Amino acid sequence: PIIIYNIPPRSVVDMNVDTMARLFELKNIIGVKDATGDLNRVNQQKKKMGPDFIQLSGEDGTALEFNIRGGVGCISVTANVAAKVCSEFQEASISKNNSNLMAEANEINEKLTPLHKSLFIESSPSPVKYAASLLKLCSDEVRLPLVKVTEETKKTIRSAMIHANLI
């Protein structure tokens, strides 16, 4: 199966809903990782392709609203350093008919929001590598042309990791 990755900020091309619909006619295309930032797309794509078109958020920061509107998950950057919490968040955020789980999703989202933001202050994957190094998962070394994050960014990431109860 193939998941289309629609990320206009990096590709400079936005695959519109009609293009998605045409691609979905192909046997192996099952859905999209949507990093457009346009939350209205979820409803538009669901209307055009139906419920079998898998819609995954490509942005941690908007994943809650994305899932509320009909998405079914997120291909997450933050999950690289907070897998368990992100998994709990996703499970709760797709449980629209359970007010307790939605409250839990909101609570987790508030806890993770500073981390989501901090992991994109500088070019990816340098911030994620630094966050992972705080968990002793790896070193913060990156290869050129990437560089390590600045001291200011390190402080922001560390603070966000503490806020999320990860360190």
Predicted features along the sequence, with ranges:
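Glycine/proline-rich, positively charged
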Residues: 1-50, 54
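Short, well-ordered helical secondary-structure segments
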Residues: 2, 19, 56, 115, ...
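Glycine- and other small-residue-rich loops at beta-strand/loop junctions that grip anionic moieties
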Residues: 5, 9-12, 33-35, 56, ...
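A generic "binding-loop/recognition-motif" signal
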Residues: 38, 59-62
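Structured C-terminal cap/extension of enzyme domains
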Residues: 61, 65-167
